[in-house]
Each structure stands twice: as structure tokens, then as C-alpha cells.
Amino acid sequence: MKRRSLLLSLIAVSIAAAVSGNAMAEDALSTILARKVIRVAVPTDYPPYGSVGTDMTPRGYDIDMATLVAKKLGVKLELIPVTGPNRVAYLQTKKSDLTISSLGKTPEREKVIDYSIAYAPFFDAVFGKQEIIAKNYNELTGKVIAVTRGSMQDEELSRLAPGAVIKRFEDNNGTVSAFLAGQAQMFATGTAVAATIKTKDPSVSMDLKVILSNAPCYIGVQKGEPQLVAKLNEIIREAKSSGAIDEMSKKWLGAPAGSLPE
């Protein structure tokens, strides 16, 4: 009888250990810390949030944020270049642990991924040639507007200006190139991106026409990872308190981040 009780106890302990092991394996934060590497999806076609420098090294606000997260976790950083259309898919298929890619929060995305608190300011607008008149959403009707497929700007433009002729491109470079080449009268992007274009070539005829939204950036996380989300929020709050976020924003966007939503 004692032998049978001992056997049952051993079985129970084994099952508990297996369950505990599986739980740890399913915890993204524990996996990252054990692996000693964090895989972060970042943009390389969306300056100043993410681009490739002359030395072929990724640079930008999002890259600096990814570097800060890795440093605070004490792990090595692995950067994974993504575009607007695939940055959420990389999270869903577990090709990345995080997406730090000027990601806005939408009801559709909240169904499939979770978010940290905001880490960067960002607002979207429609830009066009100076001679084009468009002061509101109605005046965008019939105008050919380039946009990156699956981006926040794509969603906003489709909802706010259904009468616009929207031409979708697979990445930000394609969107900007279409406007510069005259394939579109206007294009939708973030104001920081537009400022970068103007800085590189002041001769470009381009004015802000209509603001689409003022939506900050969040870190995207796989669904059901509360420990990882909590740790990211802790890192971001500390960076806001220390002034690191404001310094990052001044470096890449030309102004402090200011008050960011929780």
C-alpha cells in the first residue's frame, strides 16, 4: 500500500513538473531570457523611425527603442526587417518576439495582438503638391493618393475619405516613390517621414493637406503574454521618467515626446 502511494506521489510530481515546464515554455518573457536573445521586428524603409544608414546598419527611433529594451532585459538584440503589411504577421507566426515598427493601435489589430503603453509620438496626414487644393476629407474625393498597404494610413484613409482613389504599395519606399514619380497626386504618411523627404530634397513640391489622425506608437506583442507586456511597460515608464524617451524623440523627430498615453 505504501509502495502504491509512493508511486502515485511520484506520478503526481512528474505531471506537475511537466505542466510547470510547459507553462514556462509558453511564457514569452521566460523564453527570451533563457534564450538570451530578443527578436524584434523593425522598419528599414520608414525614416526617421527605421531606415538603413550608409554603413548598411539599421538606424532610427524604433531601432533605438529596440536597443533600449534589449539592454534593460540583459539580452542580445536580433533585428528583423519588416514592412507595413507583414509586421503584425511576424508576431502572429512567432517569427519575432516584439514588433517595434511605428505601430498604431486599432480595434482590428487588438483582436490579434497585444500592446505595450505608448513609446513614441506619431501623427498621420495626407501630403500633396502645393497646387492641389484639399482642405478636408470631402475634397480628397477623386484624388489619386498613394499609401502603404495594411498601414494605419491605409485604414484611416479608407474610412475617412472613401471617395479617394487609393493606390496601395507594398512598402513605404514604394508609396513615396509613386508620389515623387507622379503616379499619385498625393500620399498618406507620418509627418516625420514627410519632414525627412523635404529635408533630403527641399525642391520637392509638397504640403500637408489633411490630418488623418494623431496616434502614438506602441510595441506589439503576441496575444496572451501579460508578463512580457508588464515588463515592457516597466521599461517604457522608466525611460519616460529618466528623460530617455524625450531624448530619443528629440534626436529623431526634432522635439520631445511630451505626454504619451498609458
Locate each region found by the language model.
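Extracytoplasmic small-molecule ligand-binding "clamshell" domains
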Residues: 25-102
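Ligand-binding clefts/hinges and TM-proximal coupling segments of bilobed small-molecule sensing domains
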Residues: 26-27, 152-169, 206-208, 236-262
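Alpha-to-beta junction loops
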Residues: 38-39, 74-76, 93-101, 162, ...
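Ligand-binding cleft/hinge of the Venus flytrap
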Residues: 51-54, 66-75, 137, 153-169, ...
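Short helix-initiation/N-cap motifs at beta->coil->alpha
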Residues: 63, 78-89, 152, 167-177, ...
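Extended ligand-binding regions for polar small-molecule ligands
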Residues: 63-72, 134, 138-139, 143-144, ...
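Acidic, polar ligand-binding/catalytic clefts
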Residues: 67, 71, 76-139, 203-205, ...
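Periplasmic-binding protein-like
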Residues: 120-128, 195-237, 255-262
